[in-house]
A protein has these predicted regions:
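Non-ligating segments of multi-cofactor redox enzymes
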Residues: 1-257, 263-308
């Protein structure tokens, strides 16, 4: 049976920015490596972090799950990565896209950019673009590395190599600034990736988390579990007055009263803070809470009958 956490929900949503900052720091503990221009090579690299965080970031504490998956799939002896897939499925079942909203460094980076005071644009008319990330997951993360191989049977990590802006932000830029040899070796591929990063930065100022909505394969994978994950959104229909404030507050274009566990919901909690009746909260566990609500209603009815 799932449990609702109304008070905790309010607190988590209010301090989400601090939680994101802490998660980013934990994901990138080895900060002195930025000055050294070196990569962390410890045992932590054998474990994947939950969010999108480049393996080549000097400070990273672990491996990027998308990069690690491509490395295994694209190896000369092709094998499906059961460890990484199992790890991602576990996270998907436990948390769903809560990871996107609270634990992903690149998601937080986009949110910080969106705080820059300029005119903001809505993405409600661009909903078709949200399906692009599933194509990126299937084609660039799995199919191309697995089947487009060189003479020795190895495939490139296509997403990391040609599309991921996080690799440039956390990896190529800091490493090239600290290491003249790397700086001298930068070529057309870096220029291409850098232009993608600049585009994402510009779009993030205008749109809320555009990369997360349209292109992130990790978000696409976690989205597959949003409706069945243990961490979910709960709307108390008895408290809801249908004012629509939660839907207007949602920057992921989700109406939590209609689809509380929509694939685009990142559990950011903006709807929780916007609700004047405190009808929206986080819920963790199995079930939808209806049995517990029905039991409480029955108990109240029995008590009323006794009083009469």
């Amino acid at each position: 049976m799932g449990k609702k956490f109304s008070g905790v929900s309010q607190t988590m949503s209010r301090f989400r920015g601090w939680i994101q900052a802490g998660a980013t720091l934990l994901t990138n503990l080895h900060l002195p490596n930025f000055l050294k221009g070196e990569l962390y090579q410890g045992t932590g690299k054998t474990v994947c972090v939950p969010g999108l965080n480049c393996y080549s970031c000097p400070a990273t504490s672990g491996a990027c799950p998308i990069g690690a998956f491509q490395a295994v799939v694209g190896s000369s002896k092709f094998s499906f990565s059961y460890y990484i897939t199992g790890f991602l499925i576990l996270l998907g079942v436990l948390l769903g896209r809560f990871i996107c909203g609270f634990l992903c460094p690149f998601g937080w980076f986009q949110e910080l950019l969106h705080k820059i005071p300029t005119k903001k644009l809505s993405t409600k008319r661009l909903k078709l673009l949200t399906y692009l990330k599933y194509a990126v997951l299937l084609v660039m993360v799995f199919l191309l590395p697995a089947f487009l191989v060189n003479d020795v049977g190895m495939g490139d990590p296509f997403f990391c190599k040609y599309l991921c802006p996080q690799g440039v932000l956390e990896g190529a830029i800091p490493l090239s600034l600290a290491n003249s040899g790397i700086r001298a070796a930068l070529g057309k591929l870096f220029t291409w990736k850098f232009s993608i990063l600049l585009s994402v930065i510009a779009l993030s100022v205008l749109f809320y988390r555009p990369f997360c909505k349209w292109l992130c394969p990790l978000g696409a994978f976690y989205a597959l579990f949003n409706r069945v994950s243990l961490f979910q959104m709960k709307v108390d229909k008895n408290k809801c007055v249908s004012c629509g404030k939660c839907a207007r507050a949602c920057k992921m274009d989700v109406d939590v009263t209609k689809t509380p566990n929509h694939t685009e919901c990142i559990r950011c909690g903006m709807c929780i803070r916007a609700c004047p009746m405190k009808a929206v909260c986080f819920r963790y566990g199995f079930g939808d809470g209806k049995d517990k609500a029905k039991a409480a209603e029955t108990l109240q009815t029995n008590n009323n009958n006794r009083e009469e």
